[in-house]
């Protein structure tokens, strides 16, 4: 039975989301034939012209703006010239796996003869470059260690690597702490004083930039017979997958990278492993979207790192054998099915615990929630924290034993707008030294570890910090809508255009509309979801809609105010549309 650790701190707030429409923005000049709806949506996201909405690779920020990039190139040039053994160390999430694959593939393309890779096992090594992982890596006899998507917080691991005489290049995108690891070179756009404009590069984006800088140096040195060198854009399928899956903001720089990667995937030019993964997931490669990456490809790759070993996912991304790729993709499909079952059971536990908390607090929601269960899996706590954060609209941390019966816990934190979760953990750490063993992350997500006997003290300290940092107004969930769709916009043409537009994601959200509908009929699917038939004046017949996870035992009102996404109904085919309901409120 899970225990809730934040039942003693509540603040009054409305549990009903507030749907608020975006301010109207007049779009700029668009080519003839552009749907007015699309132009309006782009403009409301700060991209009022085609150049801003659809950035090209030519608009990418220069690699030279990254602090340490020249020194990183120097390390790699020297390693390649002297046939040194280069070991790329990835991470056990999708960003870390794609970053590892990009690093290995890219360095080999640029002439490195001895490139190896490794990745920590979540259950065995924990996060990042740890001393125990360094001890195992010694068997590979590396000369140069290149971390991707981690390293900025791995002080002990870097010290252990340097003690063995290895050079260390850290490439990362996570926020640095007050003290940097003693690596030979660090490349991280979030270093203090770094001039790179896009602070939202994923780990895979950082290593891609290092490779671009390396190729430019080699071009200028006359290394390539054709004067150009290898085409690094062939790696953008991997860059796109890692960037979208890591939920970094899709600013113009990232949108240029993701758009180019999606074009390759849609054209069937992705690596063998990603093509097999798309097939295994049942997606149509020719119509692949960023949403497909986030909800189909990313979870399947992440499943390996959550329940098994991300070495399997990296093997998929590096293989050139279609048969092997299909076999690995099917294995990942099975692991992902297991992950879904584990996640559902843990989520059910968490929901029951939080229901008891709310009842104990006379219907008030806690200002923050910390959840722990001795039987939970550490690889899935992040998904549970995310689900509970969405349901409560509160910061949530979910903990599990690092391994069965262990006294060390691994936690995953998810936050809401208004609370920078990594800064909150940093403040707890500063006020209570030694309470948290390790932590790191971003504004909206973080990871941490601590001893089981420190949990109660941490709970009190964390809640105190949340009460101090979080404006009570932030506890009222704000749902930002793109407004109401006209009757003639509720059609397959507009739904299809929205699907293939974007790419949508963090910081450039997928369009969400709102409107008032009459519920003609409804039924429950799989004991969790609501399937509705709706009527809207001016629209002939009825409109299909589905609210995933929307069944909580109460029938919907006859008249409802919906926040929804417009989608094609792939099951009905033809010109059918379906509304994907995000919020259902009585009208």
Regions found by a protein language model. Give the residues of each.
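A short acidic, amphipathic alpha-helical/loop segment
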Residues: 156-160, 369, 384-387, 493, ...
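Flexible glycine-/small-residue-rich
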Residues: 90, 148, 170, 189, ...
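Active-site cavity-forming subdomains of large catalytic enzyme subunits
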Residues: 135-204, 208-225
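N-terminal amphipathic/basic leader segments beginning at the initiator methionine
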Residues: 1-28
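Hydrophobic helix-and-loop "lid/oligomerization" segment in the mid-to-C-terminal part
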Residues: 22-141, 164, 182, 216-453
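Histidine-centered active-site/metal-ligand motif
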Residues: 173-174, 377, 442, 529
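A residue-level signal for conserved active-site and pocket-lining positions in enzyme catalytic cores
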Residues: 42, 146, 302, 498, ...
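Mid-to-C-terminal polyanion-binding domains and interfaces
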Residues: 74, 78-82, 322-371, 405-407, ...
């Amino acid at each position: 039975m899970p225990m809730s650790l934040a039942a003693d701190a509540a603040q009054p707030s409305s549990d009903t989301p507030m749907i608020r429409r975006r301010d109207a923005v007049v779009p700029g000049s668009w080519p003839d034939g552009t749907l007015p709806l699309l132009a309006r949506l782009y403009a409301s996201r700060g991209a009022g012209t085609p150049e801003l909405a659809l950035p090209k690779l030519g608009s990418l920020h220069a690699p030279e703006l990254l602090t340490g990039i020249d020194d990183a190139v120097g390390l790699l040039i020297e390693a390649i010239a002297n046939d040194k053994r280069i070991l790329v160390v990835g991470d056990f999430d999708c960003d870390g796996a794609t970053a590892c694959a990009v690093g290995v593939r890219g360095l080999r393309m640029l002439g490195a003869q001895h490139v190896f890779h490794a990745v920590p096992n979540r259950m065995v090594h924990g996060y990042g470059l740890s001393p125990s992982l360094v001890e195992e890596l010694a068997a590979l006899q590396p000369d140069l260690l290149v971390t991707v998507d981690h390293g900025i917080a791995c002080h002990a691991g870097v010290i252990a690597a340097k003690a063995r005489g290895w050079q260390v290049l850290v490439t990362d995108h996570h926020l640095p702490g007050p003290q940097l690891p003693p690596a030979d070179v660090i490349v991280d756009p979030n270093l203090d004083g770094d001039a790179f404009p896009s602070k939202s590069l994923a780990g895979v984006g950082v290593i891609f930039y290092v490779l671009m800088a390396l190729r430019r140096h080699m071009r200028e040195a006359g290394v390539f017979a054709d004067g150009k060198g290898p085409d690094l854009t062939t790696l953008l399928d991997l860059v796109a997958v890692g960037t979208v899956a890591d939920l970094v903001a899709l600013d113009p720089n990232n949108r240029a990278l993701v758009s180019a990667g999606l074009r390759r995937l849609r054209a069937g030019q992705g690596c063998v492993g990603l093509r097999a993964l798309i097939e295994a997931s049942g997606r149509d490669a020719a119509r692949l979207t960023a949403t497909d990456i986030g909800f189909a490809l990313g979870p399947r790759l992440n499943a390996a790192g959550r329940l098994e070993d991300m070495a399997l996912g990296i093997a998929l991304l590096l293989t050139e054998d279609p048969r092997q790729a299909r076999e690995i993709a099917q294995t990942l499909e099975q692991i992902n099915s297991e992950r879904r079952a584990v996640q559902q059971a843990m989520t059910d536990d968490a929901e029951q615990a939080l229901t008891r908390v709310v009842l104990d607090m006379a219907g008030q929601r806690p200002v923050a929630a910390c959840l722990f269960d001795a039987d939970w899996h550490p690889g899935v706590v992040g998904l549970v924290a995310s689900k509970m954060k969405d349901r409560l609209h509160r910061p949530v941390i979910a903990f599990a034993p690092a391994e069965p019966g262990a006294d060390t816990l691994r936690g995953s934190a998810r936050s809401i707008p208004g609370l920078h979760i990594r800064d909150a953990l940093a403040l707890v750490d500063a006020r209570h030294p030694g309470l948290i063993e390790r932590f790191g992350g971003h504004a909206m997500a973080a990871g941490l570890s601590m001893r089981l006997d420190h949990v109660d003290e941490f709970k009190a300290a964390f809640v105190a910090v949340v009460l101090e940092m979080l404006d009570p107004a932030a506890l009222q969930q704000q749902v930002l809508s793109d407004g109401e769709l006209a009757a003639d916009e509720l059609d397959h043409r507009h739904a299809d255009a929205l699907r293939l537009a974007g790419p949508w994601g963090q910081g450039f959200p997928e369009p969400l509309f709102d409107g008032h509908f009459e519920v003609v009929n409804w039924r429950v699917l799989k004991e969790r979801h609501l399937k509705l038939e709706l009527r809207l004046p001016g629209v002939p017949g009825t409109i299909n809609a589905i609210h995933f996870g929307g069944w909580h035992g109460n029938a919907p009102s006859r008249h409802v105010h919906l926040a929804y996404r417009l989608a094609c109904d792939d099951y009905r085919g033809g010109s059918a549309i379906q509304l994907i309901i995000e919020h259902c409120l009585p009208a």
